[in-house]
Amino acid sequence: MIVAVGHDLIEIARIRRMLEREGVRAERLFTATELAYAGRYRDPAPSLAARFAAKEAFQKVWLRPHGWRDVWVERERTPDGPFPYAAPMLGFAPAIAGEMHERGWVAHLTLTHTREHASAVVILEHLEQRAAP
């Protein structure tokens, strides 16, 4: 059952300006893994903007305060298949992960960006317990 849906849209230029003006701030918003992933690209701003949108979209479904780095976007490497990485997913600090588990919730994430905007949608789903056959 769907519990909540969150969406965020951000201008990539906003993140680019932040990176140019306040390089130290990036470490307050993003994990080292997120920064390393985005740093592989000539222009890291679109990737970081999508990750910022994911954090904002999650905030819209998780109505309690948390730190920027308590939620992050991760991508596991896939050993097989046509793409080197699996679909993006959200990672959580232990307190959030524990509550999500207790409630039986999982978060689904999709990211996209154009030249000007990045967007993220988070769907919070309750996994219903199914009786054994």
From Swiss-Prot:
Mg(2+) binds at residues 8, 56. Signal peptide: none annotated. It comes from the Bacteria. One of its GO terms (biological process) is fatty acid biosynthetic process. Its EC number is 2.7.8.7. GO terms for cellular component: cytoplasm. It is found in: Cytoplasm. Its cofactor is Mg(2+). SUPFAM superfamilies: 4'-phosphopantetheinyl transferase (SSF56214). Keywords: Cytoplasm, Fatty acid biosynthesis, Fatty acid metabolism, Lipid biosynthesis, Lipid metabolism, Magnesium, Metal-binding, Transferase. GO terms for molecular function: holo-[acyl-carrier-protein] synthase activity; magnesium ion binding. InterPro entries: 4-PPantetheinyl_Trfase_dom, 4-PPantetheinyl_Trfase_dom_sf, ACPS, Ppantetheine-prot_Trfase_dom. It catalyses: apo-[ACP] + CoA = holo-[ACP] + adenosine 3',5'-bisphosphate + H(+). Its main location: cytoplasm. Transfers the 4'-phosphopantetheine moiety from coenzyme A to a Ser of acyl-carrier-protein. Belongs to the P-Pant transferase superfamily. AcpS family. This is Holo-[acyl-carrier-protein] synthase.
